[in-house]
Amino acid sequence: MSTSPLSVVILAAGKGTRMYSDLPKVLHPLAGKPMVQHVIDSALTLGARQVHLVYGHGGDLLKAHLSGQPLNWVLQAQQLGTGHAMQQAAPDFSDDEDILMLYGDVPLISAATLQRLIAAKPQGGIGLLTVKLDDPSGYGRIVRHHDRVVGIVEHKDASEAQRRINEINTGILVANGVDLKRWLARLDNNNAQGEFYITDIIAMAHQEGRQIAAVHPERLSEVEGVNNRLQLSALERAYQQQQAQRLLLAGVMLTDPARFDLRGELVHGRDVVIDTNVIIEGKVTLGNRVHIGSGCVLKDCQIADDSVISPYTVIEGARLAQACTVGPFARLRPGACLDAEAHVGNFVEMKKAHLGRGSKAGHLSYLGDAEIGAGVNIGAGTITCNYDGANKHQTVIGDDVFVGSDSQLVAPVTVGRGATIAAGTTVTKNVGDGELVLSRVKQVQLSGWERPVKKK
């Protein structure tokens, strides 16, 4: 078992021609984040002291998307094979560290599998991740002698006998820095592809009497790469299936696990129920007995115990206290905050707005930059007019206020505790405690009036 410090090399120089995209292949998202970010996260989970990212095509885009990551950027100007890519990073290797080689387009490799691989690496030898396939066509074959790994032969260079081998190379390996640099310096491109194969170091290690330990991943999907969108979609489904199984086993009821997408992190309590076609992004926290209806999208939000989110509601950057009810077809934008037992109904939008305990906004309203007290009724069609064309302004509504339907509150404005706003009122001035305010046009009734008749 190796106790050396660890650095990681991630190969990400490929163009991804078969993706038919202007975006570098490794930046295509899986579960809401770039494929290569999944690999970086696994590397950092292992405690890597340095992560070298070998890049080529789309370097500017890669650096823009990954600007906040602790990476050592290594340019591979020409893509001449995996061995060539590692040669570009080799000057940065320390003699006393282990080097783990990963791929930016193999996104589901788990930290647990990599930890087993690192632990299995013999002193002075190589840890190699391999897998057995029913159809190994196109992959490098693992060559063994008396059950010991002695080499890897690429498919195009393999003999007929070697092509019958079903154990294949995943490309993921770990070796000590001083050994790896020596082997990389001896690589040549005398093969059918005219490339420098990293796999040639296996035979070199065997010739030196070094041991090669083969380890298998927990799941085949961990070592499956992406060359086209079909493969990417298959890995997306594999990932989502894993997440759904994990949540079900942890007590979350997913009505249909095949129709659930987790694109971030879900923290949950007991007896949570999530209906079909729900998407969770960022970090979402659901308390005990929370029910999420079909078709909801939740992003970076907190929903406390006994709350019910009805179908087709979108919640982002919001906080909901206990026993809130929201939706259907509601939208809570960043900064929305609901106190306990508050209700937001269909076609209501909130942004940077606080709705007090037991307050209700049942229908067809916009509440933006608003501070709303407890026990308030917001009538259908109420609008807080928060934008004057240049700046946003706040509306403050005290406790126990009744706002009639089709009212507009032109901010900045304050409505005092217990006030009543009559239906159809436009509030432009502050309203005192307990006051009634109404600004309707006087009703006029004309007897004997007839509608115009269309001219023929």
UniProtKB/Swiss-Prot annotation:
Listed GO CC annotations: cytoplasm; membrane
Cofactor note: Binds 1 Mg(2+) ion per subunit.
E.C. designation(s): 2.7.7.23, 2.3.1.157
Positions annotated to bind UDP-N-acetyl-alpha-D-glucosamine: 11-14, 25, 76, 81-82, 103-105, 140, 154, 169, 227, 333, 351, 366, 377
UniProt keyword Disulfide bond, yes or no: no
Function: Catalyzes the last two sequential reactions in the de novo biosynthetic pathway for UDP-N-acetylglucosamine (UDP-GlcNAc). The C-terminal domain catalyzes the transfer of acetyl group from acetyl coenzyme A to glucosamine-1-phosphate (GlcN-1-P) to produce N-acetylglucosamine-1-phosphate (GlcNAc-1-P), which is converted into UDP-GlcNAc by the transfer of uridine 5-monophosphate (from uridine 5-triphosphate), a reaction catalyzed by the N-terminal domain.
This protein's name: Bifunctional protein GlmU
Organism: Edwardsiella ictaluri (strain 93-146)
